[in-house]
């Protein structure tokens, strides 16, 4: 699938927005959008379209905007409407010669409630245009698309706000408009089913989406995050996953301590924060090779590259022909870039190693791996008790409690009450609000009869007794001994009659297991099995895997690992509402 098409469509939309007004203009962004939209349009592109200033949208108005045209680009959020109103009122109060013009674009869709709010605030009439910036998916890499809806899971489970399901459905319609109709759709979980039902309803209203002939995508698997909560809480042990958990990767960029790098390394260095910024994506050859490896395999790759560069440097140049010398000189910038890349990733690997070789990290990892193996899940865990006694960061304690709860299909009521008492005593009464959120989200609960995780661990081989990290034969390598259930579902589906067999195995998990076939208007699709179809062609099948509620880099690495196995003959396009890790996922539930 050519992800470039998606980027080009978003750029066309953006050009229309920027050309809505003549001359110099300022953009005031919803802060959550600046980074993702930067993946679609670089700064030079904005300059070409006469954008002279960019500001984040904040409660206190900007005072120094000296251009005539002000464009607001925002998510449909009522609080942000108050910020827009404050900015417009502040501008209108100034004594100036020329009036300013205001334009508002909602990403991805307008909202009736937001427009109403602007009327109440008395600024609706001041806006020359209220439009839409239709960009549902942001392209993070050539196989990875994210909607960047950071609170989707929380909105669904805590706030009962299902607007992200409608947005997901719109994104899937947009995908089919670009790449053609997806003939086969499979899914697991209530919200996965809801997203698909809304998508079908929208397709019926929109003939352009429905009449498409089958495109380049063969099928789609929609996975509701609530089906597999263990994988989102587990520590990722891949190179990219660890960088994300320790330093945070946002819109493919990571900020690292500047003093560890040469001044020439990285995109930029911020003197105030003393951070150097790096872009991490598959355009950099070495990172593409490292990103999906277990961290214990990273050293081997780095040392191989170092030897290769050294041997190139030691080649004798005296007996080369002029033609060979010319070739050598032309290749010098490429060699220099390789050396730079090797130096950067060797330093990043050292930074990561310092963290993961600490006792704190290893002790916590040991505790979570015991839970993955279902050992001692029915009684208070002594490591968790020690963490509480030491007043360790609340998030670390809650994560392990939630993992114990998932492994035991709930905590025994006595154990749950005991943990609650201990937490309140040490961290204060407000932790009860957080615990309430975790209970609503399905992360913490009292035990019921059925041991779901325990059974699935056996039937789907979710854990390995001995880790295979350097030359893995199974997806367990991404967490050392644990295979993400979400990806195991995809892997099982690739087998003959895989979905039928899965339907039975997954019956104990919440929500329906469904399959659907979209025939084109002119031709009904044969319900043939996926595998019989695959054998007729050597072209890899393209499968979209869509996570409703977020997915981790470890899950992405596991899917890439599956696509590299020759027997599977598939290519995955991974779509998600948000890229998450154990920290960012839990933070949405913690009440400060």
Predicted regions and their residues:
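Extended, well-folded catalytic/binding cores that form a central cleft or groove in large enzyme
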Residues: 1-592
